[in-house]
């Protein structure tokens, strides 16, 4: 049966690498309420406090679902293209990353893709049991803007650098389906229907933010 990967960017944090702000906590609470009826096998989150706390708050609405820390869900550079292949603004942005970040990030991204976006026939033991019982698999990944953009770009067969510009608001919801024998499908992207207007668009670049909605 199909595998469904739910991707949520962490809630607003203040300061940037600290715990969630009050806004971020409310965003996470509403996200948990939105997802409370999904039969998740697990909630995976990156190691940074803002992702871990978002996952914990969401999990309060999903009793019994295990919460699992996962380095693959961290905040890193998923792909480092040749600057000559990029629009100038993107090339300038990527110039700020170190050689180590350019080397290690793509390794983590490749491992994350193998773990969370595997093709049909590459299931782990639990997924094989689900398949034998004709059950869809649902997993929630609480992570960061870059990795969500990377997984979406790969699902759509876009050029490897095109994770750039696929931005997520805090606690926006993206869902990718991996049906057996078929290409991945993007079910929703950056969905914020569970957030009131005053809690939307945080963390989103002002230059491409809609005027309202």
Residue ranges, per PLM feature:
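Phosphate-coordination/substrate-recognition cap region in phosphate-metabolizing enzymes
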Residues: 29-100
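Acidic, low-complexity terminal tails and accessory targeting/binding regions
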Residues: 1-2, 64, 75-85, 123-137, ...
């Amino acid at each position: 049966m199909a595998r469904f990967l739910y991707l949520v960017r962490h809630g607003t944090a203040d300061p940037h690498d600290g715990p969630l702000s009050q806004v971020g906590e409310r965003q996470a609470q509403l996200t948990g309420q939105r997802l409370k009826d999904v039969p998740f096998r697990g909630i995976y989150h990156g190691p940074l406090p803002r992702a871990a706390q978002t996952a914990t708050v969401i999990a309060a609405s999903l009793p019994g679902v295990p919460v699992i820390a996962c380095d693959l869900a961290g905040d890193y550079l998923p792909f480092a293209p040749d600057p000559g292949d990029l629009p100038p603004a993107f090339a300038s942005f990527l110039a700020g990353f170190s050689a180590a970040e350019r080397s290690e990030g793509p390794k983590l991204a490749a491992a994350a893709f193998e773990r969370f976006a595997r093709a049909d026939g590459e299931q782990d033991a639990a997924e094989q049991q689900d398949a034998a019982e004709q059950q869809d698999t649902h997993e929630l990944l609480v992570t960061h803007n870059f990795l969500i953009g990377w997984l979406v770009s790969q699902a759509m067969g876009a050029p490897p650098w095109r994770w750039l510009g696929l931005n997520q608001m805090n606690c926006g919801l993206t869902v990718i389906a991996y049906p057996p024998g078929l290409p991945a499908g993007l079910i929703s992207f950056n969905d914020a229907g569970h957030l009131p207007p005053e809690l939307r668009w945080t963390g989103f670049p002002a230059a491409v933010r809609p005027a309202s909605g």
